[in-house]
Amino acid sequence: MEKQWTSGLFSCMEDSETACLTCFCPCVTFGRIADISDEGRTGCGRCGVFYGLICCVVGLPCLFSCTYRTKIRSKFGLPESPTSDCVTHFFCECCALCQEHRELKTRGLDPSIGWSGNMQRTMAPPMSQQMMG
């Protein structure tokens, strides 16, 4: 049974900070999503720069970004909706990036601190407690 996205494709303003960042600098949002989706193997900066190059040279960043939507869907068992991943990114690039970013945040992963930051946060040793006497 497929789970559902935790927010709609057009619910960008549920996280206005990410919506503004994505509107003016989608390469940063994409880099963050890619870093989490690839579990830190590719890095935010590298993917963000590659996204920017595709944007400038080809003009179709959706050719690259839709593959990360597929990764997120596979990881969390989400439906390919409202249309295929490539069509969603082609027509609604910023909305798709915002939805993916929100999905990661809702599932406990903070894209703004990257994969390694999330792993450090998850695996942080407990604070030592001392008795006051």
Curated annotation (Swiss-Prot):
Major site of localization recorded for this protein: membrane
InterPro entries: PLAC_motif_containing
Subcellular location: Membrane
Membrane topology of the entry: Single-pass membrane protein
UniProt entry tagged with the keyword Flavoprotein: no
TM ranges: 49-68
Protein family: Belongs to the cornifelin family.
UniProt-recorded name of the protein: Protein PLANT CADMIUM RESISTANCE 7
Lineage of origin: Eukaryota, Viridiplantae, Streptophyta, Embryophyta, Tracheophyta
Gene: PCR7
